[in-house]
Amino acid sequence: MSKKITILIDAGHGGYDPGAIGIRGLKEKNINIEIALKLEKLLNHDKMFCTILTRHNDSYLSLKKRKQLLKKNQVNFLISIHADSSRKQNVSGASIWIVSKTRINREINNYLKNKSTLLFSKKIENIFKQNKNDFFLKKTILDLQSNNFQKIELDLSKEILKQLEKNTKLNKKYPNYASLGILSSINTPSILIETGFITNILEGKKLKTTNYQNKIANSIYLGLKNYFTKSSYILKK
């Protein structure tokens, strides 16, 4: 694979949006950016990857602006970093989420109805231009692409979960589905990683430490490395 894989690392929340609040006022946004920066460093030291961060510091970025970065930079994959919370302080562990089929179907239908301009592969762009009025063909192509993306998301999530399990408890051992805005791009495979529960006393304390943040970032990096080394993933053209 000669061309580098472009990963958009999204550090959830930021600025006036603290995200979840944990033990002793621990703010999710701070955990997210620390892990994101560590992951960025690991990926940028690997010739296979190049990275873009949605934020480099404690700044607020709207969902719309985060998603615009996917289009501007021809991103191959989105990793959104978050920390979880619960009213039950005994709940702990990491998990990974991918977009639900219901949500992605809605996004595809919205695109076809609104005919908005989004960044596709050149191959798909050309097909759409040649078949402007063929709704069924466009829908079929986007459905096939979303099915392919979902397989990528599932397989990658499993690789990352394998690595996370070596360093932390898993709240959910398999990828889960949700209707999350950050994951709803019809053009880019995306996953959201909940790195642990900041409302759990022990896990919250761990998530604050550089050592534990490094372990989480390294687990994500190794999962990405293992997946893309083994897979037949083809870059957008």
UniProtKB/Swiss-Prot annotation:
Coiled coil: none annotated. GO terms for cellular component: extracellular region; outer membrane-bounded periplasmic space. Pfam families: Amidase_3. It comes from the Bacteria. GO terms for biological process: cell wall organization; peptidoglycan catabolic process. Its EC number is 3.5.1.28. It catalyses: Hydrolyzes the link between N-acetylmuramoyl residues and L-amino acid residues in certain cell-wall glycopeptides. Its main location: secreted. One of its GO terms (molecular function) is N-acetylmuramoyl-L-alanine amidase activity. It is an enzyme of class 3 (hydrolase). Residues 7-225 form the MurNAc-LAA domain. It is found in: Secreted. Keywords: Cell wall biogenesis/degradation, Hydrolase, Secreted. InterPro entries: MurNAc-LAA_cat (IPR002508), N-acetylmuramoyl_amidase_3 (IPR050695). CDD domains: MurNAc-LAA (cd02696). Cell-wall hydrolase involved in septum cleavage during cell division. PANTHER family: N-ACETYLMURAMOYL-L-ALANINE AMIDASE, N-ACETYLMURAMOYL-L-ALANINE AMIDASE AMIB. Belongs to the N-acetylmuramoyl-L-alanine amidase 3 family. This is Putative N-acetylmuramoyl-L-alanine amidase. The lineage of its organism: Bacteria, Pseudomonadati, Pseudomonadota, Gammaproteobacteria, Enterobacterales.
